């Protein structure tokens, strides 16, 4: 539709002091934005759930809640509404694609509960968003569905994707400093995935 979608992980939201140092801020584990054509501030449409934007002297001014929470996160709804951020289980953004006039996006599940194995990848969520309307409308980028149990990969397939003319989407990640690749059966991220793997002789195939 001519717009650019941005996703962010572990970002600071809040106020900046006159000397450009960071003031009181929150640290949402993921957030999203749409950039419309142009180079003005109003072309950056932040799809953020702000705690409050009315009183600069009150707590949590322009601080933001995490866009999409992991279902295993343990903070209460009351604490989330107050502006606290999950630190135990979270999602980090993967890549996204357009299918059937909707945006499909992969979110990587991260377990941050083991001090001996922090930031452990343990699965993937497939989320689908509406593209009806225009940025700023309630319908645009509305979350239509999410499959928190899409897969249980410990690798971040789909950190980067390539939509090929052959009808597949190729999903890339790294493992032990080597590239790992999967691909979808169709241009639908929800279609069957297959993996480029080697046999005992080192010959790669799907």
What positions do the PLM features span?
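Beta-rich catalytic cores
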Residues: 90-93, 155-157
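Hydrophobic core register within WD40 beta-propeller blades
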Residues: 96, 159-161
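Beta-rich carbohydrate-recognition and catalytic domains
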Residues: 2-89, 98-152, 164-206
